[in-house]
């Protein structure tokens, strides 16, 4: 029981750290992030690139999609203009996973203590920088905690059952990644936990790649929930996010086992292998779909016609 409580607490702290990092970055970078975002949506390539940047700042594709759906619901952004932004936000979300894959155990306390001192100054931009440092320190502390709990978790019946299904087949691993991400509303937390288990040699690379693919689908749940009370354009935007991610996974999943050898060569570090795979998957699928935005727009209109 204590292990499960500790694991749950680490997830909550990880989410809190992500929120602190996001707030600090937004405060330092842009005072009116939403208004500035609208200036760059007049061309698909510009919308694609700016969504990568803003998702990197927000540290969350879910948060970015909630903002986008809010604009669509308000009628200041058309559904068609959101399609390249959906492609870009998936790429931008991989910045977080690349960052947390770096081994930074030795600087955790430097980030926490330094962040606290900066925060206590109460001065701009030191306070905002301190908030980001504190958030980052908490994230790396949680990653370290997940690694320490990975072994004990496998000895629990629930943990053993989940790991059995993850390692049983790619489909099971994909489903678990999708459900876990949908429950905690953060693909970064899901992949952070996955990296910790990989570092302990508990999960194989191919199965871990499947979890990443599932996480890409599960992360869409926040956008779908945000669009429930919106109009048809908002619903089209949310479901376009789902359809794009499902199609991307469907394209890659049949070749996953064959791609494992290539991913194996990307880095000697297990966590970085997963981070690099997530980046490559999202970049490749985004570049494949970007020239097809008009076709994709018509497809969504067929699936969810406006009334």
Curated annotation (Swiss-Prot):
Membrane topology: Multi-pass membrane protein
GO cellular component terms attached to this protein's record: plasma membrane
Protein's UniProt keywords contain Secreted: no
Gene Ontology MF term list: sodium:phosphate symporter activity
Subcellular location: Cell membrane
Main location: membrane
GO biological process: sodium-dependent phosphate transport
Keyword Membrane assigned: yes
Keywords from the named record: Cell membrane, Membrane, Transmembrane, Transmembrane helix
Regions that span the bilayer: 1-21, 52-72, 99-119, 133-153, 174-194, 208-228, 242-262, 277-297
InterPro entries recorded: Na/Pi_transpt, NaPi_cotrn-rel/YqeW-like
Protein name: Uncharacterized protein YqeW
Gene (UniProt): yqeW
